[in-house]
Amino acid sequence: MVRLTLDLIARNSNLKPRKEETISQCLKKITHINFSDKNIDAIEDLSLCKNLSVLYLYDNCISQITNLNYATNLTHLYLQNNCISCIENLRSLKKLEKLYLGGNYIAVIEGLEGLGELRELHVENQRLPLGEKLLFDPRTLHSLAKSLCILNISNNNIDDITDLELLENLNQLIAVDNQLLHVKDLEFLLNKLMKLWKIDLNGNPVCLKPKYRDRLILVSKSLEFLDGKEIKNIERQFLMNWKASKDAKKISKKRSSKNEDASNSLISNFKTMHHIVPVYYPQVGKPKLAFFSEIQRYPVNANASPESS
């Protein structure tokens, strides 16, 4: 295995010191270091590289993030496909904008408090034990709420992403090949993420639910791409018109049901208050039987008696 040292950087960076310039002075000027796929398993003290802004260390054997406290100007850090199990020792990287940690052994997204400039976080394809899923530390989510714009959490056995509602400036979410199941949970999240214009959920069970795409388009006005497919204005307008028509029918049916209930109630009350009784009265020919309510048994004329007709 190989350790990343200043000497290794000096020997492999094609440094060309000017006259009377030392190697140390050259190292201070370095802004980019690329040691990807070099069997590196540890990072030594690189404090001389104070102007380092981009560090490529992907496809190595690094198990622990160390000795980066000096890199206060670092904006891009590539550590994907290593052996890292814990996100740590990054809080001094105040200017960090992009962090790539995919393909490691990370079980909890944590330790990112204080990284107020972090805009992209890539933690896809973690090599987790069977049955485990990637989790989010609420403290880290709160810390990234204002800054994070792009998040990749694909293939991590995740079954719930409602906690991501805190990421109010998130505009791209890639969460393919997880275990998301409920459309209602996604509707809740999209209602919160008002700036989200791209979401990819391919490979989740929820994608097979009836009206899955229609429901997500209807709930989010900002969404432009869903599962890699553009949402055209004509598609959204059609769904909005369909929903408006459906809602109008529901309201009409509800009103009709209320009117019917009121009518039935009135009839029932009338029958209860005024009992129907039979009345016999003499008539030429065969006697007839008439039915009147109690309030109809007597004529309006007070001078007439019931037997006078």
Curated annotation (Swiss-Prot):
Compartment list: Cytoplasm, Cytoskeleton; Cytoplasm, Cytoskeleton, Microtubule organizing center, Centrosome
SMART domains on file: LRR_SD22 (SM00365)
Record-linked Pfam families: LRR_4 (PF12799), LRR_9 (PF14580)
GO cellular component: centrosome; cytoplasm; manchette; microtubule cytoskeleton; microtubule organizing center
A single GO molecular function term of this UniProt record: dynein complex binding
Keyword tRNA-binding annotated: no
LRR repeats mapped onto the chain: 29-50, 51-72, 73-94, 95-116, 117-138, 147-168, 169-190
InterPro entries given in the database record: Leu-rich_rpt, Leu-rich_rpt_4, LRR_dom_sf, SDS22/Internalin_LRR
PTM field: Phosphorylated; in the testis.
Keyword field contains Lipid biosynthesis: no
UniProt xrefs under Gene3D superfamilies: Ribonuclease Inhibitor
Keywords linked to the UniProt accession: Cytoplasm, Cytoskeleton, Leucine-rich repeat, Repeat
Residue ranges of domain LRRCT in the record: 204-242
PROSITE patterns documented for this protein: LRR
Function noted in UniProt: Regulates phosphatase activity of protein phosphatase 1 (PP1) complexes in the testis.
Assembly: Interacts with PPP1CC isoform gamma-2; the interaction is direct. Interacts with actin, dynein, KIF5B, KIFC1 and tubulin. Associates with microtubules.
UniProt protein name: Protein phosphatase 1 regulatory subunit 42
Gene, per the UniProt record: PPP1R42
